[in-house]
Amino acid sequence: MTLIFQLTLFAFVGLSFLLVVGVPVVFASPNGWTENKQVVFSGIGFWFLLVFAVGILNSFVI
């Protein structure tokens, strides 16, 4: 169970870093928002899923 928690937490941190870097780049590019809107929303949705998964898995680890 600890390994699953650690992998989920690593994915959460990695995705958070990608979103922190990627979303401003998308907004700064000329047609970035219209072309990458679906990718940004998918990333945000997956981020929320990982937030809840880390919270639930945390209750089993501690």
Curated annotation (Swiss-Prot):
One BP annotation, GO: photosynthesis
Subcellular location: Plastid, Chloroplast thylakoid membrane
Topology in the lipid bilayer: Multi-pass membrane protein
Pfam families referenced in this protein's UniProt entry, alphabetically: Ycf9
Bilayer-spanning residue ranges: 8-28, 41-61
Role according to the record: May control the interaction of photosystem II (PSII) cores with the light-harvesting antenna, regulates electron flow through the 2 photosystem reaction centers. PSII is a light-driven water plastoquinone oxidoreductase, using light energy to abstract electrons from H(2)O, generating a proton gradient subsequently used for ATP formation.
Identification of the protein by name: Photosystem II reaction center protein Z
Organism of provenance: Tupiella akineta
Gene name in the database record: psbZ
